[in-house]
Curated annotation (Swiss-Prot):
Couples tyrosine kinase signals with the activation of the Rho/Rac GTPases. Probably plays a pivotal role as a signal transducer protein during fruit fly development. Residues 216-396 form the DH domain. GO terms for cellular component: cytoplasm; cytosol. The gene is Vav. This is Protein vav. Residues 432-541 form the PH domain. A zinc finger (Phorbol-ester/DAG-type) spans 552-601. GO terms for biological process: actin cytoskeleton organization; axon guidance; axonogenesis; border follicle cell migration; cell migration; central nervous system development; compound eye morphogenesis; dorsal closure. Ubiquitous. The keyword Phosphoprotein applies. It comes from Drosophila melanogaster (Fruit fly). Keywords: Guanine-nucleotide releasing factor, Metal-binding, Phosphoprotein, Repeat, SH2 domain, SH3 domain, Zinc, Zinc-finger.
């Protein structure tokens, strides 16, 4: 029988035992702390999902607040502990304290905090919840709320439970979705609010279909424009119908706390909607995709908004609770806005929902756009840009929550000032908290094993000792710290060790690279040991990324104060803590995964004068300066076939045979061709080429040659020359000019137009131009410049 029970441990064990955890889920659903469609409530759900949902203690604290709002101040527990053990344990302790003091649950019916966090005895957790569901106070406060009962015989507990919960502990890992906050429910509600306020109504779409012959692509464009208009109405309402009336009762600081960056969002989206509508007009100068690309950076303000949103809702609730006039005014504003159907706290969530919709709307538009359509490639880039923005916002929000955790770590260590590393007590310099927990440690020069609580950050391992711990409180005294850059992790022998505390049996060796000292860490299980080894190894790898072996850049993990893009891929470095890496020499900034592609380090590769030309490249209209592939493609995609530019590659050369330069050309098959310029050492001089077929003394000579000859000798099938510089200066001839026979000069006729290719001979009175297919020099005094074509065309 035990074998049969064990085999069904997560899908539902036979008998009462198999139903117990599902009955607990059903009760939590009746309490409305998890929604009916929660993962744990699905028919194929496993018990581990419930365990991980409860593990951080957030849902448990929300549960007792739901059962009795006076039992716990919501500000006392950590709503986003991000699985930091000391914060999760604090939440669990608070829950147990409320169960005992407020609901009268006996100590014998309470579980120990480690039983839940370590998942060593989840059965006891279910017992506590069962007792809570049936206690007298809950029945008095919620007479219609049916609890759940636990009735197991000793035989069933000794066989079924032991097998189930041992298996639960050994198989449940930290990468399972584990938030017990009811976020799924919150997100569902926020999505419903967004749909109610911003989404297109079906009647509107059907009316359009009945009156106009629209393609599916047109529907998607209309959905984007109309939902944006609806969203701007929501922002405007927040500003005028809520902030406006409240201005008479709250000061500006209080308004900023409740309505973070709302005024700025109104301004941004007013301009954004105008640009979107303008992009749909005939002969529009800027297309829709470019509008999204242009607003890529302004949209980063949502990182701050989303980070402040939860605090805004809390502050609003606190103000309304303390001030009846404010509370009544807010309710009046809600009635005036939408007949009271939605609360202000619900409406405040709409901006976060909207910013995360843009890449989805663009994805729909891309799918409804033919790959042969002129806008296809630019729409794909716009979609990728909005995905990048969404990821940036999510990481800023996550790191903002993490900064709170770091501050709580600092507050929990009473003498953190004893740290002797870096700036002492400023924990922010050490990066994110990767792992924390209890372990034993033994220095090899000191045979005494010590019980410690440890915090692993990106850069440092901090050892503390627990002080007298009250329920719901965690305080430590500082003992030691180790810069992880000085260490490596080694697996000690795999045999379990037996000491005075038999809980800590599994070893991990932390050895100094200098070989002078080493420490042995003792953990409770193989799973714990593997978790600590992984955290320490990842931290050390982040300090010395493998990609650094492929370049001579002096990279260091770095926290950037302002939004920064990666020099290699041009995407944002995301978050607020250690977003990426910066070279200590040339200051370029990159993602960890892009380090190996950064090429050779130069003190300042952009400002160094081009070493390959006998004249300044900036004198030529085809020279674009520092520019990545994506930007070059955007500059050229809507230009005529044969338009080209020479650019400095931001990442620099990746091999000794590459230069920092590349040509980008719009070809006759409507594709942007990017061509690296290579170099070869020829005795005392350097030669430049696109391939080994032909070499030139300067890059100017190379460009000049391929202006007159196609590139097919280097690239099979590319029967295209460099025809039109991307900066087009048009000049009109004022006089006739007849060049000498056999010279490299242009013939001019009064009023004829010349495309000015370059002004490299300006000091001598000559410009270089093109008329038709003929390229040559002409006297600059014989012409008058007309216009400079926009680089954005």
């Amino acid at each position: 029988m035990a074998s049969s029970s064990s085999s069904n441990s997560f899908g539902g064990v036979a008998g009462v035992n198999g139903d117990l955890w599902r009955e607990c889920v059903a009760w939590l659903t009746r309490c409305k702390v998890i929604p009916p469609d929660h993962k744990a409530a699905q028919p194929d759900a496993e018990i581990r999902i419930l365990a991980m949902t409860l593990r951080d203690g957030v849902l448990l604290c929300n549960l007792v607040i739901h059962l009795d709002p006076s039992s716990l101040d919501p500000r006392e527990f950590n709503r986003k502990p991000q699985m930091a053990q000391f914060l999760c344990s604090k939440n669990i302790k608070l829950f147990l304290d409320v169960c005992h003091n407020n609901f009268g649950i006996r100590d014998a019916d309470l579980f120990e905090p480690t039983m839940l966090y370590d998942l060593t005895n989840f059965h006891r957790v279910l017992i506590t919840l069962s007792k809570l569901s049936q206690c007298r106070k809950v029945q008095q406060l919620h007479p219609d709320l049916i609890g759940f009962n636990l009735q197991l015989s000793p035989t069933e507990r000794s066989h079924s439970d032991e097998a189930i919960y041992k298996d639960l502990h050994s198989t449940t890992t930290d990468n399972i979705a584990c938030n017990g906050t009811g976020y799924d429910h919150t997100n569902t509600k926020e999505e419903e609010v967004y749909q109610d306020l911003c989404a297109l109504h079906r009647t509107s779409r059907s009316q359009t279909a009945s009156s106009t012959s629209f393609e599916q692509r047109d529907y998607v464009i209309r959905e984007l424009i109309d939902t944006e208009s609806n969203y701007l109405d929501v922002l405007t309402a927040l500003k005028t119908k809520f902030m406006g009336p409240l201005e008479r009762h709250l000061n500006q600081d209080e308004l900023r706390l409740i309505f973070p960056r709302i005024r700025e969002l109104v301004d941004i989206h007013t301009k954004f909607l105008d640009k979107l509508r303008e992009s749909l007009t005939p002969n529009a100068k800027v297309k829709m995709a470019q509008v999204f690309l242009d607003f890529r950076e302004p949209f980063l303000i949502y990182g701050e908004f989303c980070s402040l949103l939860l605090g805004a809702i809390d502050y609003l609730a606190d103000v309304c609770k303390k001030n009846q006039i404010i509370d009544q005014l807010v309710q009046k504003c809600e009635r005036d806005y939408n007949v009271g159907k939605l609360q202000l706290r619900d409406i405040l969530s709409v901006p976060m929902q909207r910013i995360l919709k843009y890449h989805l709307l663009l994805d729909k538009l891309v799918k409804e756009t033919s790959p042969l359509h002129d806008d296809y490639r630019s729409l794909e880039r716009a979609k990728e840009a909005m995905i990048d923005v969404s990821q940036y916002i999510n990481e800023v929000k996550r790191d903002s929550d993490h900064l709170v955790i770091i501050q709580k770590v600092k507050d929990s260590i009473c003498d953190i000032h004893l740290l002797q590393n870096g700036n002492g007590s400023d924990l922010l310099q050490y990066g994110r908290l990767l792992l924390d927990g209890e372990l034993h440690i033994k220095a090899h020069e000191d045979q005494k094993t010590k019980l410690r609580y440890a915090f692993v950050f990106d850069k440092i391992l901090i050892m503390v000792k627990a002080l007298h711990i009250k329920t719901g409180d965690m305080q430590y005294t500082y003992r030691d710290s180790h810069n992880l850059a000085d260490y490596r992790v080694e697996q000690s022998h795999s045999r379990r060790t037996i000491g005075r505390d038999t809980r800590f049996k599994y070893q991990l060796l932390l050895a100094r690279k200098s070989g002078k000292t080493a420490f042995t860490l003792y953990l409770k299980s193989e799973h714990e040991r593997d978790k600590w080894r992984k955290a320490l190894t990842e931290a050390m790898e982040s300090l010395e990324p493998p990609g650094c072996q492929s370049t001579d850049h002096k990279m260091e993990i770095y926290t950037f104060d302002a939004p920064t893009t990666c020099r290699h891929c041009s995407k944002f470095l995301k978050g607020r803590i250690h977003q990426g890496y910066r070279c200590k020499v040339c200051q370029i900034s990159v993602h960890k995964g892009c380090i190996s592609s950064t090429g050779r380090c130069k003190q300042n590769p952009v400002s160094v004068p081009p070493p390959v030309c006998d004249r300044q490249l900036s004198e030529f209209n085809w020279f674009a300066g520092n520019m990545d592939r994506e930007t070059a493609a955007h500059r050229l995609e809507n230009r005529r076939i044969g338009t080209y530019l020479l650019r400095v590659r931001p990442q620099g050369p990746s091999t000794a045979h590459e230069t920092m330069y590349a040509l980008s050309l719009k070809t006759d098959d409507n594709v942007i061709k990017h061509m690296k310029i290579n170099q070869e050492n020829s005795g005392d001089s350097m030669l430049y080429c696109l391939s080994s077929r032909r070499h030139f003394k300067t890059i100017v000579e190379l460009v000049s040659y391929y202006e007159r000859n196609d590139l097919g000798e280097n690239f099979a099938g590319l029967n295209q020359s460099l025809q039109w510089p991307y900066k087009e200066v048009i000049a009109t001839a004022l006089y006739d000019y007849e060049p000498k026979a056999g010279s490299n000069q242009l013939q001019l006729r009064t009023d004829c137009q010349v495309l000015v290719i370059g002004k490299d001979g300006d000091s001598k009175g000559w410009w270089r131009g093109k008329i038709g297919d003929t390229v040559g020099y002409f006297p600059k005094e014989y012409v008058q410049e007309q216009k400079l074509a926009s680089e954005e065309l």
